[in-house]
Amino acid sequence: MIKASLRRRTSNYGSLVLGLALLGGVSTALAPSGHAAVPARSDQSIAVRDGRNLYLQGCSTCHGLNNQGGAGGPSLIGVGSAAVVYQVESGRMPLSNASVQAPRKKVKYTIGQIDQLGVYIQSLGGGPQIPSGNLTDGDLAKGGELFRTNCSSCHNYAGAGGALTYGKYAPALKPASARVIYGAMLSGPESMPRFSDGQLNTKDKAAIARYVQFVTHASDPGGSALGHFGPVPEGLVIFLVGMGALVVVTLWIGARA
């Protein structure tokens, strides 16, 4: 009896020890580590961080460390990512020197970096944003009508640009991408007005962007476009060439006589 009782107790102790060991192992496996993995940040927050780094390197000298603006440049709070696309993708920013109007230059940033800058500026106070997707799928005929109504008085009917007052000018539109055209309509840079969705909705802006891309990349089957300035230079060339031809013919006839 005593031996049987000892065997039962020993067996019970063994089961208890085995159970405690298993429980300890499970607890250790499930317990949180002192170096728990930090949840991955969203792509948005990473873009904001990278955009701020780009801003501090290339923009803060003029616009301030906190985008508050200063003597060298205006505040960027609330301007939106559309302004970034227009200014940076066209090469106007960073500004190389103070002038009446920022000229178009070679672009210093990649499209990815421009988008990161835009995300950062957008995070500061919102503002106009360029919609994603195809920006040149609008109605071409309607885009031409809207362009002639709202844009041609400054940019010329063919987007060749023109002079304005006080040393400013409406730039030629040929090098501009659809994003730059759309960003200009949303942000209203320099002397250009800002077109809200109440004035030109998203379809209207897409139509204008398509028309600009079409007219600035169209071929000239009639020969030299003469800057697309219209009938004035065309008439002048015809007059000079025609009169020159008449003078030559007259001299030739006189010489033969």
Locations of regions flagged by a protein language model:
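Ser/Thr/Pro/Gly-rich low-complexity linker/stalk segments immediately outside membranes or between
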Residues: 33-46
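N-terminal Sec-pathway targeting helices
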Residues: 5-16, 187
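Short, Lys/Arg-rich N-terminal segment immediately upstream of the first membrane anchor
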Residues: 1-10, 173, 226-230
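Extracytoplasmic electron-transfer domains, predominantly the class I c-type cytochrome c fold
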Residues: 77-124, 164-220
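Periplasmic/extracellular electron-transfer cofactor-ligation site
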Residues: 44-48, 52-78, 90-99, 123-132, ...
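C-terminal capping alpha-helices of c-type cytochrome domains
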Residues: 12-33, 106-131, 196-256
